Curated annotation (Swiss-Prot):
Catalysed reaction equations from the record: 2-C-methyl-D-erythritol 4-phosphate + NADP(+) = 1-deoxy-D-xylulose 5-phosphate + NADPH + H(+)
Cofactor(s) the protein needs: Mg(2+); Mn(2+)
Chain sites annotated for binding NADPH: 15-18, 41, 130, 132, 210
UniProt binding sites for Mn(2+): 155, 157, 226
Role noted for this protein: Catalyzes the NADPH-dependent rearrangement and reduction of 1-deoxy-D-xylulose-5-phosphate (DXP) to 2-C-methyl-D-erythritol 4-phosphate (MEP).
Pathway where it operates: Isoprenoid biosynthesis; isopentenyl diphosphate biosynthesis via DXP pathway; isopentenyl diphosphate from 1-deoxy-D-xylulose 5-phosphate: step 1/6
Pfam families, A to Z: DXP_redisom_C, DXP_reductoisom, DXPR_C
Gene source species: Bifidobacterium longum (strain DJO10A)
Family matches, as Gene3D superfamilies: 1.10.1740.10, NAD(P)-binding Rossmann-like Domain
UniProt name for this protein: 1-deoxy-D-xylulose 5-phosphate reductoisomerase
Length: 396
């Protein structure tokens, strides 16, 4: 679907990394976009108010409804007028489903699924950075589409694959190759990781991301989730998806075709590029991000993934092959473990170990009906996975 020349846009997770960079892209193209609504968790109320004032939005929502009075006060302080303030998860879902031309979903976590579904059902084009929507509730998400090609992937890897797939038909695809920077601990062995601190893990060598995604990138769980997402978004089985470590983060992913040709998308690491394409596809915008400088000597390297040191990708592959419910448990247990690590309640190696232990506990009960019947069933399973993760964490 071609986006209208002056598109209405709603941004979910506007104060996070994806949201702030999305607004930066939009600010450079005021003739193309009108931001009508912003939603955020509630941790950065002043920033949300400033964004609402700058973009003259009609509605601002916070997941944490106890922050509504603070947001109202901050909006007044920022000089924002006529902004309707709403609070609670239902208000964010309602905003997502209000019928904007484009909804950019930059929410972190599976709480982003219901807003994604609402946006699709309302006919909006969904610029999706919330990979958990696909990982935890894939078929619930896809069945909400009211037309083909309603989802524009915003993750840099999936945007790269999406662009590269234009070079051939689906039948001509031999494999997808997802690239990984390797994170801050590339080259480390498992024994070296026992005493890693949150401060160390939050220092990513190439990307500027939120804390949960940054930790996931360091454990390579993020790459595992991306393999799941790529398989489901592009209908390619997991055995035809490879992962390669590319420390320079210039090649964002590749598609190998049956004739031996490999097509990639390459650019300096800057999330504004996939965000911009997610907002405007199939058209491209000017003045988005820097291109590669081909006048300068450069070396791009690729190396195999060390599955022994970073078992998260193999664990994700196992869950992808098992069922949608396995991938939902993987995601929920991981979110719980990452938060515990950030709060210094769980050692670094305990993150993936906890996730595997929860999956081992729940494996038998997950092997009935592999698909969720509705979001409530998914939510209940995730709650159980989080509870079991907490039990294991508290025993550390």
């Amino acid at each position: 679907m071609s986006i209208a020349s002056n598109s209405t846009v709603i941004i979910l997770g506007s104060t996070g990394s994806i949201g702030t960079q999305g607004l930066d892209v939009i600010s450079r193209h005021p003739e193309r976009f009108t931001v009508t609504g912003l939603a955020a968790g509630g941790a950065h109320i002043e920033l949300l108010a400033q964004q609402a004032a700058q973009f003259h939005v009609s509605e601002a929502a916070v997941f944490d409804e106890t922050k509504v009075p603070a947001l109202q006060a901050a909006l007044a302080q920022a000089g924002a007028q006529g902004v309707r303030v709403t609070g609670g998860p239902d208000s964010v879902i309602a905003m997502a489903g209000s019928g904007a031309n484009v909804v950019l979903n930059g929410i972190t976590g599976s709480i982003g699924l219901e807003p994604s579904i609402a946006a699709l059902k309302a006919g909006s084009q969904l610029a999706l950075a919330n990979k958990e929507s696909v990982v935890a509730g894939g078929h619930l998400l896809f069945s909400a589409q009211v037309r083909e090609n309603q989802i524009n992937p915003v993750d840099s890897e999936h945007s790269a694959i999406w662009q590269s797939l234009r070079s051939g038909t689906h039948a001509e695809v031999a494999k997808l190759v997802v690239t990984a920077s390797g994170g801050p601990f590339r080259g480390w062995k498992r024994a070296d990781m026992e005493n890693i601190t949150p401060e160390q893990a939050l220092h990513h060598p190439t990307w500027n991301m939120g804390p949960v995604v940054t930790i996931n990138s360091s454990t390579l769980m993020n790459k595992g989730l991306e393999v799941i997402e790529a398989s489901r978004l592009f209908n390619v089985p997991p055995e035809r998806i490879d992962v390669t470590v590319h420390p320079q983060s210039i090649v964002h992913s590749m598609v190998e075709f049956v004739d031996g040709a490999t097509i990639c998308q390459a650019s300096p690491p800057d999330m504004r590029l996939p965000i911009a394409l997610g907002l405007s596809a199939p058209d491209r915008m000017t003045n988005v991000a820097a291109a590669c400088d081909w006048t300068q000597a450069a070396t791009w390297t690729f190396e195999p993934l060390d599955d022994e040191a970073f078992p998260a990708v193999q664990l994700a592959r196992h869950c992808l092959a098992a069922s949608e419910k396995h991938t939902a448990v993987l995601n929920a247990a991981n979110e719980q473990a990452v938060h515990a690590f950030l709060e210094h309640r769980l050692p670094y190696l305990g993150i993936v170990d906890t996730v595997k232990a929860v999956l081992d506990q729940m494996d038998a009960e997950l092997r009935g009906n592999p698909l969720f019947t509705d979001v409530e069933e998914m939510n209940q399973l995730e709650l159980e996975a989080r509870r079991r993760a907490d039990d294991l964490i508290n025993k550390q």
